[in-house]
UniProtKB/Swiss-Prot annotation:
Belongs to the centrin family. Coiled coil: none annotated. It is found in: Cytoplasm, Cytoskeleton, Microtubule organizing center, Centrosome. Ca(2+) binds at residues 42, 44, 46, 48, 53. CDD domains: EFh. GO terms for cellular component: centrosome; cytoplasm; myosin II complex. Monomer. This is Caltractin. Keywords: Calcium, Cell cycle, Cell division, Cytoplasm, Cytoskeleton, Metal-binding, Mitosis, Repeat. One of its GO terms (biological process) is cell division.
Amino acid sequence: MQKYGSKKIGATSATSSNKQKVQIELTDEQRQEIKEAFDLFDMDGSGKIDAKELKVAMRALGFEPKKEEIKKMISGIDNGSGKIDFNDFLQLMTAKMSEKDSHAEIMKAFRLFDEDDSGFITFANLKRVAKDLGENMTDEELREMIEEADRSNQGQISKEDFLRIMKKTNLF
């Protein structure tokens, strides 16, 4: 949904683990920053960049894409040339920014649970939140929730565990 005469452009994205669509709006400043990164790495001025240039341009915008992620991104929009144009790049970066926003929201939620700032959600943290929300949950139910999310068997939920679980819920 590109509007050239307006202040913002929107793009819809869906992450592979999250089929829910997220609509974000780019400001003119963000669009300009993306355009500058694209132009900087479009060395030959062809209006297209290849996988290597895509990776460097994404890094310039603050992302750390893996080689496989780059291949997947390009194969999803490539017309056989192995290169993508600015509009495709803009769409990819809008999707990545949307993912970044969702990560920030999940971390914000984590901090609400992690009241003692320990870096973990403990049984006591979970019990407090359940009580604050008026959820009548038994200690056993709360312990089961922690066990379900806790991959390292520490009896508490790490940021990584919380992020993984929240991404599975399709809420973010």
